[in-house]
Amino acid sequence: MTNILWHQHPVDQAARAEQKGQNPVLLWFTGLSGAGKSTLAGALERALFEAGFHTYLLDGDNVRHGLCKDLGFTVEDRDENLRRVGEVAKLMVDAGLVVLSAFISPTREERDSIRARFPTSQFIEVHVSTPLSVCEQRDPKGLYVKARSGEISNFTGISSPYEAPLAAELTIDTSKGDLATQVRALIDYLTAINVINADKAKALA
């Protein structure tokens, strides 16, 4: 690896961001299966996209159709799954995009490892803190039923622990309030930290 050097391109992140008129950032949505991560991230992306932002949503299920299709669900494979996603997200942020990632990402160590790849201002952890009882009641994929019956092992929240963030930038319980209000809270936060500038904020009003 000592002979492999990072090549500096003539167009850098700042130039790409300026062209797009936005501040690139990664929003990392973490929480139990069924918490509403993908729904919330998707609704936020739609709002941002319609306001003229350049966005991309990385979803836990979708990446396993290609980027991570060779991985299973062992602890080692799940770690590698998130490592790959973190690297892809880093490239996308470098391209000047607003990136949203929706992954259970159950351990603090995994999430902190991804956070460490970004400047402080470019990583926003969103804890989707919907209680286990609500997630299990929703069970959109029937996974909790299978986990309770023993058909699925090492299932986060049932037979494998979920370590809630200690200091997430935002915490949203999707069992409280409606989706529009939850998206509004995200937009207000992004506006406050200047990810959304004043001109584009008007389009999101």
Swiss-Prot record:
* Annotated CDD domains: APSK
The family database entries (InterPro entries) matched by this protein are listed as: APS_kinase, P-loop_NTPase
Pathway note: Sulfur metabolism; hydrogen sulfide biosynthesis; sulfite from sulfate: step 2/3
Task: Write down the top EC class of this protein.
Answer: transferase
Query: By its UniProt entry, which Gene3D superfamilies does this protein fall under?
Result: P-loop containing nucleotide triphosphate hydrolases
Q: Does Phosphoprotein show up as a keyword for this record? A: yes
What cystine linkages occur within this chain? none
GO MF annotation, one? adenylylsulfate kinase activity
Q: Name one GO biological process term.
A: hydrogen sulfide biosynthetic process
Q: Active site located where?
A: S105 (phosphoserine intermediate)
Catalysed reactions listed for this entry? adenosine 5'-phosphosulfate + ATP = 3'-phosphoadenylyl sulfate + ADP + H(+)
Q: Does the keyword ATP-binding apply?
A: yes
EC number(s) recorded for this UniProt protein = 2.7.1.25
One Pfam family assigned to this protein is: APS_kinase
Q: Which residues cross the membrane?
A: none
Positions with a binding annotation for ATP? G31, L32, S33, G34, A35, G36, K37, S38
* Keyword tags: ATP-binding, Kinase, Nucleotide-binding, Phosphoprotein, Transferase
| UniProt-listed NCBIfam families | apsK (TIGR00455), PRK03846.1 (NF003013)
What the protein does?
Answer: Catalyzes the synthesis of activated sulfate.
Q: Which family does it belong to?
A: Belongs to the APS kinase family.
Stated name of the protein: Adenylyl-sulfate kinase
In its UniProt entry, the species of origin is given as: Shewanella baltica (strain OS155 / ATCC BAA-1091)
